[in-house]
Regions:
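Alpha-helical scaffold segments that flank or form the walls of functional sites
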Residues: 57, 76-144, 170-186, 435-440, ...
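C-terminal cap of metal-dependent C-N hydrolases
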Residues: 371-428
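Active-site gating loops and adjacent loop-to-helix segments of metal-dependent hydrolytic enzymes
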Residues: 74-106, 150-168, 228-253, 275-278, ...
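Histidine/acidic-residue-rich catalytic or RNA/ligand-binding cores of hydrolases
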Residues: 228-240, 268-273, 290-299, 316-331, ...
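His/Asp/Glu-enriched, well-ordered alpha-helical/loop segment
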Residues: 248-255, 297-381
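N-terminal metal-binding scaffold of metallo-dependent hydrolase/deaminase domains
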Residues: 1-44
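Metal-coordinating catalytic core of metallo-dependent amide/deamination hydrolases
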Residues: 135-261, 267
């Protein structure tokens, strides 16, 4: 693949900008720039050369969704104005339990298509207790970089029987998925160990999940300190604050990504930094569920890696990295008037720090040998303006762009989305299929509710 004439924003430093520069990628990796890119493109024997005209456009490392629930895409626009725990109990857990493989597939394909069309190249997906194969199948068909797996939930006191799996069953399913999917699709698919949160898992399961992740070298993906009621419940049950408890059971570490950390405090900042654990900041979800505002400036000052995620379409209603970037940039200005989060830092959180949170191997950014996972933006589409006012384009991206500015999304050196193709290569399910899946899901939810009334 040859991307010609773009402005390359590598995001290694604020001045990591190369204007009017060609980029050549082969076998999923960036190989060369400028004249050398043209030379390699002419000499390639890897088949037909794909050319992208990026003149007047910006090329940057791909956006990463560091916390996502693809199983919830069809649950969008359900009950509103709820806080976390009642929202889970009333809508989300019944909805997840009502999935079959077919509706899970529709939900995943729709969410992945929505993500690719917004420039997202990689996702860390929480999945659900069952039908995880449908998620991996959708990811494999889409060409997105996918880290996910089944969700572990076994506590009979806090989880519904329809969405519960005994510890042995849940861990065995994670092992099966690892054998079936890990490293498949040219390495684009990875399995994670995913205890949902301390509220829904027994202590024994949490400890065994940590052991399994260590044994297999897998990413750990969980929720923590999202909501005050959740934090109080965890401390009442375990005798420890939420994040300290995760450390006590062995779940913190450099391959762990914790979603939210809204109510993390000073001891947590130091502990997360010491363990090398990443945090996925999900501002729109935290606002919509009245959870609060993540202390991102304090986390970053402590040395904690902070990435961005949209959470699920059921709790923010859009899988849109641009909205998360905007909110991530603006919210600190309300909470901490004396400081701000620069647009450059927000873009790093949405890209390079997201890749780090997913433990993606190899060099990051736009350097030779880095993954050819790229987002190409058109600054002159819609209401954004070219970067005439500033030598740096970062503010324009964080504050005034949206998915309409995404000209193309490249994953592993393959174009997976072009703006001219709103169907995302046929990945997006037709409207009739989406409506049918929602109706089937809702009918099963209503039947289950009537049976327990």
């Amino acid at each position: 693949m040859l991307i010609e004439g773009g402005t390359l924003l590598g995001l290694a430093a604020r001045d990591d900008i190369q204007r009017g520069t060609d980029l050549y990628a082969e076998d999923g990796r960036i190989r060369a720039f400028g004249g050398e890119a043209q030379r390699l493109a002419r000499a390639t024997e890897k088949g037909p050369l794909v050319r992208l005209d990026a003149r007047g456009k910006w090329v940057l490392p791909g956006f990463v969704q560091a916390h996502l629930h693809l199983c919830q895409t069809l649950l969008r626009n359900g009950p509103e104005d709820l806080e976390l725990l009642p929202w889970l109990q009333i809508h989300v857990w019944p909805g997840e339990a009502a999935h079959d493989a077919d509706t899970m597939s529709v939900s995943a394909r729709l969410g992945i298509a929505e993500s690719l069309s917004a420039g997202v190249t990689a996702v860390l997906d929480m999945g659900s207790v069952r039908h995880s194969d449908a998620l991996f199948e959708a990811a494999a068909a889409s060409g997105i970089r996918y880290v996910g797996g089944n969700v572990l939930m076994d506590d009979p006191e806090t989880t519904p029987p329809t969405l519960r799996a005994a510890a042995e069953e849940g861990l065995a399913e994670t092992k099966r998925l690892h054998g079936e999917w890990h490293g498949r699709a040219n390495g684009l698919l990875s399995v994670a160990v995913q205890p949902r949160f301390a509220v829904s898992c027994t202590d024994a399961l949490m400890r065994r999940a940590a052991e399994l992740a260590r044994d297999l070298g897998l990413v750990v993906h969980t929720h923590a300190s999202e909501n005050r009621a959740e934090c109080a419940l965890v401390e009442r049950r375990t005798g420890l604050p939420n994040i300290a408890y995760l450390d006590a059971v062995g779940l913190l570490g450099p391959r762990t990504c914790i979603a939210h950390a809204v109510h993390a405090g000073e001891p947590d900042f130091a502990l997360l930094a010491e363990r090398g654990t990443a945090v996925a900041h999900c501002p729109s979800s935290n606002l919509k569920l009245a959870s609060g505002v993540c202390p991102v400036p304090e986390l970053r000052r402590a040395g904690v890696r902070v990435a961005l995620g949209s959470d699920g379409a059921a709790c923010n209603n859009l899988l849109d990295p641009f909205r998360e970037m905007l909110l991530a940039a603006l919210l600190p200005r309300a909470r901490y008037p004396a400081e701000h989060l620069p647009a450059f830092d927000v873009l790093r959180m949405a890209t390079r720090e997201g890749a780090s949170a997913l433990a993606l191997e190899g060099p990051a950014g736009l350097t030779a040998g880095a993954r050819a996972d790229l987002t190409i933006l058109d600054p002159e589409t819609g209401w954004s303006l070219p970067d005439d006012w500033s030598a740096e384009p970062y503010g324009s991206i964080a504050y005034s762009m949206g998915r309409g500015n995404v000209a193309a999304t490249v994953v592993d050196g393959v174009v997976r989305y072009r703006r001219e193709d709103p169907s995302v290569g046929g990945l997006k399910p037709p409207a009739d299929e989406i409506r049918g899946a929602v109706r089937a899901l809702r009918a099963r939810m209503e039947k289950a509710s009537a049976a327990t009334a």
